[in-house]
């Protein structure tokens, strides 16, 4: 084997070999249980980020683990067309490169442009997924706009429409005036903002007066510009100030519209003035109030968010109406909405109707992609009746057909599902699945799979002109069908029968509503088993936390703290990293701050660590928490782990290749160390499998690390040296056999998490075991064997390790050279301790570098010594002639002074209020941790001073 482990040389050729050999495909053995994971489809034109790498590492670990258990495994791969995101990228691109908008191109040509862009950049993410070692079946790769998936989308839409579960209605939606489309509640980002509350007088009509004799009501509003669309004023029916006015009218300022005063709980007596203006077409709460009191709806805004030239007037049901005039005063027409706000306030003030303006804290909705203030807008949209679909989806989780891991996410799911609103599925975009609905000139709507079907079903001749609905479906509509559309539905395919319901869905908790809930609803409605019972899309939902940076901040381009997973695999120079983080920024003014931060964090760029080290780190971080802080130190630690495994394997091979390892018969004697490592390894298998079976990848990674590094490399390889240097033929055969057996099993155990290094080493080790199979990927996963757990060997070895560590600690504390042989005395020995010493003198003398071992008689106290206690004995190392007492005390005093300096430096830092207020929580925690470490070190040194002073 090469002297050093070089991931760059092995990873890509190995992956290409695996893919070419077809190892990622299902084994097709239908007598075996199937295991299937559907990858959450990433955006087709995107690139891999840490969240993808994290979730895909977990999925690949599960798939490889189940594949090695002989299951018929499918990891279904694919990408998402990501409507709004992809359209925005291409719109930006043509604006930057050609100075054009999509309207300059027209719909067909612009969509062609997007397909071109997909062809150009659509391969990036799949290339990157290969680099991660993902063992997905590439031959089954799907895209949400593939013909097959598009047919499934049409099929679902048509069936839901025929069942009256999809309808078209004029409703209030979140409108993004920049992107000119409806967006869902989940895509709205609410930001805290400092604003104003305007108090405006609305004159009472017909000589009415308030309880205290005023001829006007004072209405408090944060949105004076929408006054032009008011159709009522609400007061609380219990409010003594106004309840006698319910049913009377006010005259709306500026427009002179006569509008009613209604009694409604929405008006809060304690808030503002207790009178609320009602604009059903421009506010979600007002829309509901308007419905309850049959108020008309007046839309005063264009889709760009400007004031219209004439208003649209509708009755409560959304039909056009002439109950009110559609006139808008000329001075406000065509004004942008925030300019209109100023103009309305000025006009009201000029009439003497502006009573006061108060500062007011409010929450303002922004579109998370367009970045502008969202406008509630009255539009015709398509909706899914969600309550009908939600009922079975709630029951599936209640009765355990679907389980959430961690379980607490079930409550999050229930709270949303039990109060679910109808789902607005239409989007005013061009890129996506076009809604399969057609209109004739009279405005009648026809829904069908295509225009021919519509004409046939409705007997429409060629003379009837039809135009297709311009809108496309919400991206999440097609994603909701992902588990079954990818397997060939609506055809009843073999794949659907074999792999549905799927086994596990891995997802971030941030898309539990967007995606998880909707998959459950859609799947249970459309997929039934042979008895007609609704099928769930998956049995388990494993929710991951979100990967944040080392300070707990969300990774984002604007913060400049994004780490590309492949930069940790391949390494990246500082100039390249700076270019990546500060080039093409949406907010160039942040570049300087980002540059400084990056230079501080990565002064030499990022070193290459290889894919396995990245995967191991991600698995080790997969705790059950919501937030997972990335840690470069751990990545370095797991790269060191890979090096350690490589070097240990070289040691094993150097001692076994070309030797008799006992795989072809011959007498074998197992040493205590051999019996111990086999017992440890089997206990490791058991605990590791339990961790993987319960989705505790962090615990599994910890178990693997602890066994490999501490037990196998640090102890067992050392413990084999006495046999290797002077054992009998049978002992040598036994130890070689154990070395190879444990290493080969360990490689299979570790393979799901670190596939590349394990396959590479295994190819060398398999020859020694007489294995002829081609790949570790299809080898059986290690099984726990209770007969290999030798309790006596475990107990005896544990004791020997304690004794060896005790002697090593005395050396370190007393500053004695590691190579100097020592004399060891044992005092107050139990029978067990004496037996252990006598049976294992060779081990003890070699590993603790001892020149002699003497068990003292019961009454002998022994000479002046440094002592350590182990189970059933006291270990003594006589100090005569080993150290110079004065020099040693002086050295320790110097050490103590140095540590005290560090302690006071950190204490001053933590006492500085400015530092504590400014520094991130993670930084403060790190300082406290350092302080604890120094305090412990100081206590140890003082203890040593006392021991030496007493000599």
Curated annotation (Swiss-Prot):
Q: Which GO terms describe its biological process?
A: valyl-tRNA aminoacylation
Motif 'KMSKS' region, residue range(s) on this chain: 554-558
| Reactions catalysed | tRNA(Val) + L-valine + ATP = L-valyl-tRNA(Val) + AMP + diphosphate
- Record-listed E.C. numbers: 6.1.1.9
Question: GO terms for molecular function, please?
Answer: aminoacyl-tRNA deacylase activity; ATP binding; valine-tRNA ligase activity
Under which main EC class is this enzyme filed?
A: ligase
* InterPro entries, alphabetized: aa-tRNA-synth_I_CS, aa-tRNA-synth_Ia, Anticodon_Ia_Val, M/V/L/I-tRNA-synth_anticd-bd, Rossmann-like_a/b/a_fold, tRNA-bd_arm, tRNAsynth_Ia_anticodon-bd, Val-tRNA_synth_C_sf
> Per the record's keyword annotation, is ATP-binding included, yes or no?
yes
Per the record, the domain of life is: Bacteria
**PROSITE patterns documented for this protein:** AA_TRNA_LIGASE_I (PS00178)
Q: Which residues form a coiled coil?
A: 880-944
Q: Give the domain section of the comments.
A: ValRS has two distinct active sites: one for aminoacylation and one for editing. The misactivated threonine is translocated from the active site to the editing site. The C-terminal coiled-coil domain is crucial for aminoacylation activity.
- List the HAMAP family hit by this protein, alphabetically: Val_tRNA_synth_type1
Similarity annotation: Belongs to the class-I aminoacyl-tRNA synthetase family. ValS type 1 subfamily.
Subunit (UniProt): Monomer.
Entry protein name: Valine--tRNA ligase
Q: Could you tell me which species this protein originates from?
A: Escherichia coli O6:H1 (strain CFT073 / ATCC 700928 / UPEC)
């Amino acid at each position: 084997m090469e002297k050093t482990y070089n991931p760059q040389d092995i990873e890509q050729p190995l992956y290409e070999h695996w893919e070419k050999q077809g190892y990622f495909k299902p084994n097709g053995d239908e007598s075996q249980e199937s295991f299937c994971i559907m990858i959450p489809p990433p955006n087709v034109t995107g690139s891999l980020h840490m969240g993808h790498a994290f979730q895909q590492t977990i999925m690949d670990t599960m798939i490889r683990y189940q594949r090695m258990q002989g299951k018929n495994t499918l990891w279904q791969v694919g990408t998402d067309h990501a409507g709004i995101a992809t359209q925005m990228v291409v719109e930006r691109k043509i604006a930057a490169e050609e100075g054009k908008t999509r309207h300059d191109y027209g719909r067909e040509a612009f969509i062609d442009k997007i397909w071109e862009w997909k062809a150009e950049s659509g391969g990036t993410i799949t290339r990157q997924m290969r680099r991660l070692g993902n063992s997905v079946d590439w031959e089954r790769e799907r895209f949400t706009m593939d013909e097959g998936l598009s047919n499934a989308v049409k099929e679902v839409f048509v069936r839901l429409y025929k069942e009256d579960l999809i309808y078209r209605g004029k409703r209030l939606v979140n409108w993004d005036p920049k992107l000119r489309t409806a967006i869902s509640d989940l895509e709205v980002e609410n930001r805290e903002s400092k604003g104003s509350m305007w108090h405006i007088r609305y004159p009472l009509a017909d000589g009415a007066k308030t309880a205290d004799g005023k001829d006007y009501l004072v209405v408090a509003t944060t949105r004076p510009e929408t006054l032009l669309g008011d159709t009522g004023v609400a007061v609380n029916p219990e409010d003594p100030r106004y309840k006698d006015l319910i049913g009377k009218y006010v005259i709306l300022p500026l427009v002179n519209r006569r509008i009613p005063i209604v009694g409604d709980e929405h008006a809060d007596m304690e808030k503002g003035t207790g009178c609320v203006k009602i604009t059903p077409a421009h506010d979600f709460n007002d829309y509901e109030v308007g419905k309850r009191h049959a108020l008309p709806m007046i839309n005063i805004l264009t889709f760009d968010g400007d004031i219209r030239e004439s208003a649209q007037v509708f009755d409560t049901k959304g039909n056009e109406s002439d109950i009110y005039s559609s006139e808008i005063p000329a001075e406000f027409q065509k004004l942008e909405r925030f300019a209109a706000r100023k103009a309305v306030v000025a006009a009201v003030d000029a009439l003497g109707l502006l009573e006061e303006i108060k500062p007011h804290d409010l929450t303002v909705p922004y579109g998370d992609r367009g970045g502008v203030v969202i406008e509630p807008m009255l539009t015709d949209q398509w909706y899914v009746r969600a309550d009908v679909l939600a009922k079975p989806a709630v029951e599936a989780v209640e009765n355990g057909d679907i389980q959430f891991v961690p379980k607490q996410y079930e409550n999050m799911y229930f709270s949303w599902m039990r109060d679910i609103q109808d789902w607005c599925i239409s989007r005013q975009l061009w890129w996506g699945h076009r809604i399969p609905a057609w209109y004739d000139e009279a405005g009648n709507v026809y829904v069908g799979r295509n225009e021919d079907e519509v004409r046939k079903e409705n007997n429409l001749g060629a003379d009837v002109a039809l135009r297709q609905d311009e809108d496309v479906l919400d991206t999440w509509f097609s994603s909701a069908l992902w588990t079954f559309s990818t397997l060939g539905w609506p055809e009843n395919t073999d794949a659907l029968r074999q792999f549905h319901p799927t086994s596990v869905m891995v997802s971030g908790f941030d898309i539990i509503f967007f995606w998880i809930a909707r998959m459950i609803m859609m799947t249970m409605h459309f997929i039934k088993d042979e008895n007609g019972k609704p099928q769930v899309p998956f049995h388990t939902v494993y929710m991951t936390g979100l990967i944040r940076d080392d300070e707990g901040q969300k990774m984002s381009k604007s913060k400049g703290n994004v780490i590309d997973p492949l930069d940790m695999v391949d390494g990246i120079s500082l100039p390249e990293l700076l270019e990546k983080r500060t080039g093409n920024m949406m907010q160039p003014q942040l570049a300087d701050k980002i540059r400084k931060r990056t230079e501080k964090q990565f002064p030499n760029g990022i070193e290459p660590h290889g894919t396995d080290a990245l995967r191991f780190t991600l698995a080790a971080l997969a705790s059950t928490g919501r937030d997972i802080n990335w840690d470069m130190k751990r990545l370095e630690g797991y790269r060191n782990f890979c090096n350690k495994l490589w070097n240990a394997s070289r040691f094993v091979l150097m001692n076994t290749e070309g030797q008799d390892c006992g795989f072809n018969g011959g007498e074998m004697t197992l040493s205590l160390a051999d019996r111990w490592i086999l017992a440890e390894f089997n206990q490791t298998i058991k605990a590791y499998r339990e961790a993987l079976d319960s989705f505790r990848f962090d615990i599994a990674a910890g178990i693997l690390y602890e066994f490999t590094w501490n037990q196998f490399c640090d102890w067992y390889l050392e413990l084999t040296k006495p046999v290797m240097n002077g054992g009998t033929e049978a002992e040598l055969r036994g130890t070689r056999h154990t070395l190879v057996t444990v290493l080969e099993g360990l490689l299979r155990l570790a393979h799901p998490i670190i596939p590349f290094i394990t396959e590479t080493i295994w190819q060398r080790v398999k020859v020694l075991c007489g294995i002829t199979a081609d790949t570790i990927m299809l080898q059986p996963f290690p099984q726990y064997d209770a007969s290999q757990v030798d309790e006596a060997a475990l107990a005896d070895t544990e004791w020997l390790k304690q004794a060896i560590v005790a002697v090593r600690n005395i050396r370190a504390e007393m500053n004695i050279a590691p190579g100097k042989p020592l004399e060891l005395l044992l005092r107050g020995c139990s029978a067990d301790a004496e037996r252990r010493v006598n049976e294992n003198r060779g081990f003890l003398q070699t590993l603790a570098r001892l020149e002699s071992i003497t068990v003292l008689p019961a009454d002998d106290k022994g000479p002046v010594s440094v002592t350590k206690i182990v189970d059933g004995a006291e270990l003594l190392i006589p100090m005569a002639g080993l150290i110079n007492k004065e020099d040693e005390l002086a050295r320790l005093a110097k050490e103590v002074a140095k540590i005290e300096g560090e302690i006071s430096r950190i204490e001053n830092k933590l006492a500085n209020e400015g530092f504590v207020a400014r520094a991130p929580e993670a930084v403060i925690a790190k300082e406290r941790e350092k302080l604890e470490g120094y305090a412990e070190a100081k206590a140890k040194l003082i203890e040593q001073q006392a021991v030496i002073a007493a000599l």
